[in-house]
A protein has these predicted regions:
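Bacterial N-terminal signal peptides
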Residues: 8-18
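Positively charged n-region of N-terminal signal peptides that target proteins for export
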Residues: 1-6
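Glycoside hydrolase catalytic-domain context in secreted enzymes
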Residues: 19-381
Length: 381
């Protein structure tokens, strides 16, 4: 009983400090129990950066390579569970089973109602957590949404996934939806919203190697704006590059990923994932490099933290990164930086912490397609 009271009081203190403008510390409820943890990274009272550093220091190089793939294996000797990036959540999660379906993104944007859109994002985030409760290994909380591609051409077959041709409206609606997905807790993330597709992605024909030509003014005043809005407002915590090239360089290798997205907009606790089969596409589609070792090395250097390729089969990713290490194209330090970004997000989801500290761990399958969410869907339609 006293333990529960301490947790409640200390949790309230974290919320008060956050409201006062302080960076919320890790929930301090477990601080007096630090000796109970086998490793420091398991201690919720420590700052994220210290937990990440401790965890990385305990991984072998082989384990680090394995954790660079979308389907990250468990590391049983350290008590690290398996983790999967990527749950589609554009306007619901009905692809996982019976769930609430909200109007397509294009229709939602026409409401011009930030509050309503945030409510919808929150409902979808709840249902993501509900499916995660049913099967944590299959249903991850890293959501690949919202889509903030600007709708330049009505002939594009994916226009219904985006919000508008207007960068301001797209940025505001994306921020509202991602804020709902993220949740309102000062530390824990309900889900990890990941914006896509960066950058200038507006065609399906030859999308794997076509190049979008953009002058500097249009780049900064138009194409980058919706991404900047959602990321700088701390609504989104992830980014996915597009398949296409921009000015003849594959978007997955864009220098903007590091120089602009990570360093100027995002700050701490942010990661970049590739689109499916895009890493191997650097060689197979773009023909930009002649080996997967070179392609993966340059992708890591550009800012890619996690590789989505070959479905659940990590062999290509592991072989390419292992070869890149042997050839001196990347170092273990490069992998550490990428994994630090990924694990900073994983710690924010609460997967390493006691359930009583994370309010979103209480969301079960009861929230999926609930009457409350059905009414919200009806209102939004």
């Amino acid at each position: 009983m006293l333990k529960t009271v301490r947790i409640i009081i200390l949790g309230a203190m974290c919320t008060i400090l956050s409201a006062a403008g302080f960076d919320p510390p890790q929930p301090a409820a477990a601080k007096s129990q630090a000796d109970e943890y086998e490793y420091p990274f398991q201690d919720p009272s420590l700052p994220v950066q210290k937990r990440v550093s401790d965890l990385l220091s305990r991984l072998t190089l082989e384990e680090k390579v394995s954790l660079m793939h979308q389907y990250q294996p468990a590391v049983p000797r350290l008590g690290i569970p398996a983790f999967k990036t990527g749950t589609e959540a554009l306007h619901g999660v009905a692809w996982l089973g019976e769930a609430t379906v909200f109007p397509q993104a294009f229709g939602l944007a026409h409401t011009w109602d930030r509050y309503l859109i945030k409510q919808i994002g929150s409902a979808v985030g709840d249902e993501v957590r509900g499916f995660h409760h049913l099967d944590p290994a299959a249903n991850g909380v890293n959501v690949w949404a919202p889509v903030v591609d600007l709708l330049r051409d009505p002939r594009w077959g994916r226009n219904e996934e985006g919000y508008s041709e207007d960068p301001f409206l797209t940025g505001e609606i994306a921020t509202a939806y991602a804020s709902g997905l993220r949740g309102d807790h000062p530390f824990y993330l309900k889900t990890v919203p990941t914006l896509k597709h960066f950058l200038a992605y507006n065609n399906e024909t030859d999308r794997g190697f076509s190049s979008s030509s953009i002058d500097p003014r249009n780049m900064h005043e138009y194409y980058l704006k919706p991404f900047e809005t959602a990321i700088s407002k701390k609504a989104a915590y992830g980014l996915m590059p597009a398949y296409n090239s921009v000015n003849d360089k594959p978007a997955i290798l864009s220098p903007l990923l590091d120089s602009t997205v990570k360093r100027r907009w995002a700050g701490d606790d942010f990661f970049i994932v590739s689109d499916a089969f895009d890493p191997s596409g650097i060689v197979n589609d773009h023909k930009y490099y002649d080996s997967h070792e070179k392609a993966h090395a340059h992708a890591v250097k550009a800012g890619i933290d996690n590789f989505t390729d070959q479905g659940e089969n990590p062999e290509l990713t592991r072989n390419a990164l292992t070869g890149a290490l042997k050839q001196g194209l990347i170092s273990e330090k490069d992998l550490d930086q990428a994994l630090a970004n990924t694990f900073s997000i994983r710690f924010r989801t609460g997967e390493f912490d006691p359930d009583e500290l994370n309010p979103y761990s209480r969301l079960t399958d009861d929230v999926i397609n609930s009457p409350k969410h059905q009414l919200l869907a009806k209102k939004s339609g």
